[in-house]
């Protein structure tokens, strides 16, 4: 009798839809109008479908073979054979998933090995893994700061930092992007608070600007504050040895806590981490809600990430190559007359300012065989629409030149250059 019941349920698993209530209708109308407004303003985002591995040359679901210039795959490790093999091997030895949070039964030897490798890479005392850097930032501030404390944040910090700060009870202050005068004024005004934490991206993701960490550290020391750096767009390739923005400025030992991601240069999978002072990491293990209430990272991803750090420890070849590729792309685009955000980072924003123009430009580039995306409000401020190109160590010079030639053709057609 039980068996028959199960069979009937399986055969009739599609439940009838509930009748739409008046409240449901009103909500649907409101949401539909909001979506219509987004479309009319040229701000509607669509998702193109890729049917190959992430790489510099990919195929979309409509069969197009295109060059990819918009991935965070800075070191070209997303489809690296060694990284893939490490993930496959871990499937056999450690399984697919852990079905648990860390403090119950979700910690394997692989997780501890990866945390140790990250600590070694950054020269820090301890590391804690998260399912994403968004979660790492979401679980940091409310854990280590209270009502007696102050957090001072750069205005261009990533959304995850902004949301993480909103969750904490500390006094919140904000300074204009890399404005050291404003930062110092906030430090002066907040003297007497129990703890002052300066929070900044190491690299600001929409512009490719690198934070002035040497100047920030000087102020931090002068006013006895702490410093947190989200180095998601720097880990693995910024600095002489790829240790990030703090290494670039020679202040690695002065950063109290870093957050970063495994989902960009470090293989492009998923996962994030916080690394820094031992006491901070220990408290996060006890009280950080995204850590305590989220499943641990799956073993194949962890093993692949360990392999990434092994690859990075061998040489700086990939770091040097992405730097050279970015320099070549910037030089050719500038020579062609495009308006670029200045810098040396492989994030190279091509400024178009108008959202509809950015979308049309990206669409015409796709017809040329170059995959990029237009960025516009609310991802960037109103009137600051752009195409954010991202250069990889895996790009060949021929691929870069082909992309630039396509930019030039489209730019001339649309009157941009």
Task: Show where each model-derived region lies.
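N-terminal "arm"/small-domain region of PLP-dependent enzymes with the aminotransferase-like
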Residues: 28-96, 225
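Conserved N-terminal alpha-helix of the aminotransferase class I/II PLP-enzyme fold
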Residues: 85-133
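Active-site phosphate-binding strand-loop segment of PLP-dependent enzymes
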Residues: 73, 173, 177-229
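Active-site C-terminal subdomain of aminotransferase-like
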Residues: 223-226, 233, 238-344, 357
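Pyridoxal 5′-phosphate
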Residues: 176, 180, 199-202, 237-242, ...
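Conserved PLP-anchoring active-site segment centered on the Schiff-base-forming lysine
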Residues: 140-159
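Conserved PLP-binding catalytic core of the aspartate aminotransferase-like
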Residues: 320-329, 334-369, 379, 383-384, ...
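PLP-dependent enzyme catalytic core of the Aspartate aminotransferase-like
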Residues: 1, 15-20, 25, 81, ...
């Amino acid at each position: 009798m039980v068996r028959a019941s199960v069979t009937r349920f399986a055969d009739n698993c599609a439940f009838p839809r509930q009748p739409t209530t008046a409240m449901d209708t009103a909500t649907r109308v409101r949401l539909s109008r909001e979506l219509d407004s987004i479309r009319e303003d040229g701000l509607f985002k669509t998702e193109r479908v890729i049917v190959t591995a992430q790489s510099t040359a990919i195929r979309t679901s409509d069969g197009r073979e295109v060059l990819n210039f918009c991935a965070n795959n800075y070191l070209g490790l997303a489809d690296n054979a060694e990284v893939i093999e490490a993930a496959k091997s871990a499937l056999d030895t450690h399984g697919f998933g852990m079905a648990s949070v860390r403090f119950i039964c979700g910690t394997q030897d692989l997780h501890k090995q990866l945390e140790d490798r990250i600590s070694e890479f950054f020269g820090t005392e301890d590391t804690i893994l998260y399912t994403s850097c968004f979660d790492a930032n979401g679980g940091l501030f409310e854990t280590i700061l209270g009502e007696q404390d102050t957090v001072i944040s750069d205005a261009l910090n990533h959304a995850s930092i902004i949301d993480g700060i909103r969750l904490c009870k500390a006094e919140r202050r904000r300074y204009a992007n890399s404005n050291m005068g404003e930062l110092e004024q906030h430090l002066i005004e907040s003297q007497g608070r129990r703890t002052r934490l300066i929070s900044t991206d190491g690299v600001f993701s929409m512009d490719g600007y690198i934070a002035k960490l040497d100047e920030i550290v000087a102020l931090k020391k002068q006013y006895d504050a702490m410093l947190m750096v989200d180095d998601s767009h720097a880990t693995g390739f910024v600095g002489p040895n790829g240790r990030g923005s703090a290494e670039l400025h020679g202040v690695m030992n002065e950063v109290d806590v870093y957050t970063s991601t495994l989902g960009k240069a470090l293989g492009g999978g998923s996962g994030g981490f916080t690394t820094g002072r031992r006491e901070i990491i220990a408290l996060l293990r006890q009280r950080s809600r995204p850590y305590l209430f989220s499943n641990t990272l799956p073993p194949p991803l962890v093993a692949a990430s360990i392999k990434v750090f092994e690859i990075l420890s061998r040489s700086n070849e990939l770091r040097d190559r992405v730097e050279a590729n970015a320099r070549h792309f910037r030089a050719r685009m500038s020579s062609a007359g495009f308006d670029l955000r200045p810098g040396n980072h492989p994030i190279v924003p091509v400024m178009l300012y108008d959202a509809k123009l950015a979308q049309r430009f990206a669409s015409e580039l796709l017809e040329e065989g170059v995959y990029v995306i237009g960025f516009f409000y609310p991802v960037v401020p109103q009137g600051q629409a752009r195409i954010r190109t991202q250069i990889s160590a895996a790009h060949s010079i021929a691929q870069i030149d082909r992309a630039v030639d396509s930019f030039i053709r489209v730019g001339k057609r649309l009157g941009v250059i």
